[in-house]
Amino acid sequence: MKIDPKTFIQDYHLNLCIQCGTCTGGCPVKFRSPLNMRRLVRQTAYTDNPSPLFKRPELWACTTCSTCTLRCPTGVKNVDLIMGIRNFLVQKGEVPSTIRDALENTLLQGNPWGRFRDRRVDWAKDLGVKILGEAKAEALLYVGCAPSYDPRVQNISVALVRIFQKAGLDFGILGKKESCCGNEIRRMGEETLFKKLAKDNTALFIKSGIKRIITISPHCFNAFKNDYPDIGIPVQHYTQVIVDLIEMGKLRPSKEVITLATYHDPCFLGKQNKIFDEPRKILTSIPGLDFADMERSKQRSLCCEGGGGRMWAEGGTEGMRNGEIRIKEAISLGAKVIATSCPFCLLTFEDAVKISGSSDQIIVKDVSELVAEAM
């Protein structure tokens, strides 16, 4: 369906904007990019033909963290506007080459990096985990793209399998049949491909006979919970499951992990889905681990810049990355570990530690890795 930018005014409530600037004031990339959400909303609403505005490279700097939308006092759908503009550009074939490649890779191989589908389950080769279709299970551990292919993030997948096996959880994975959840695909503007992924994944979930879905990534959690129209299956992020297992006495972290740790709230888990307490409950249950929050935490957490397709976008920003800022904040707190529960956050922070030369001061861990150490 052809997109008419003139419909954006009604579709995204642009006429409600009072030009207060709250959106721009809270934007995590405002100091690194010319992106100005207040100005974009006004220009889109009051320009006869806003299409030329959409060719600005800074439109790809948005991480879709939703800080602007959540803080807007009148209900303007700022992030939906960004997604609508990107969808318009996708239809016109006017997207950056790296974004184009990520979208094509997902269509062809089921993941934005273009890794072979046959290699999607290599990480689980010796773990004895059930493959749904070959066996039945109560829960699906939906692994996701980065936890399937990225060598660093695969450690999270392995840790969670061992944790769930230790707790006696009846779960399985989809193996080679698993495809991208589509969360970033939609936020990069490919609405048609997202709808195909949602339809195909939903059919696969239902066919597998599982009773619930457990995700590793908050981005997958968000897609299944909020964007899939007909999924009809309960969805949990793994931190919710681990808390339940601890509270039921099925999982007991018993080994000491002597360190001072802080926690970074991923945008798609915290801001957008209000899961703040579970990761902290897990960390404080680990013997020997002292915990302290950074000043910017929970709803005020600083976006790492990994969402909204930023993992595949180039340009549009300059200056110190938010990941580096976040690492400095954690170090100033005295933390030796910055923990998170999102593969994208983990990767951006690990890059930030290397770039800032801070590897002798702090390490980056996923919450699941700390739990596995304590088992």
Regions found by a protein language model. Name each.
Residues 5, 11-14, 31, 41-216, ...:
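Iron-sulfur-cluster electron-transfer modules
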Residues 1-24:
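Flexible, acidic/Gly-rich N-terminal and inter-domain linker regions that tether
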Residues 139, 260-261, 338:
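Conserved hydrophobic helix-helix packing surfaces used for dimerization/oligomerization
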Residues 236-241, 247, 251-273, 285:
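Catalytic cores of enzyme domains
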Residues 17-23, 27, 62-68, 72, ...:
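Short cysteine clusters
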Residues 147-237, 268-284, 290-375:
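Cofactor-cradling patches in redox/metallo enzymes
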Residues 17-41, 271-274:
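A broadly conserved sequence feature marking short terminus-proximal activation segments
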Residues 1-9, 35-52, 277-288, 310-314, ...:
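Short, charged low-complexity linear segments at domain edges
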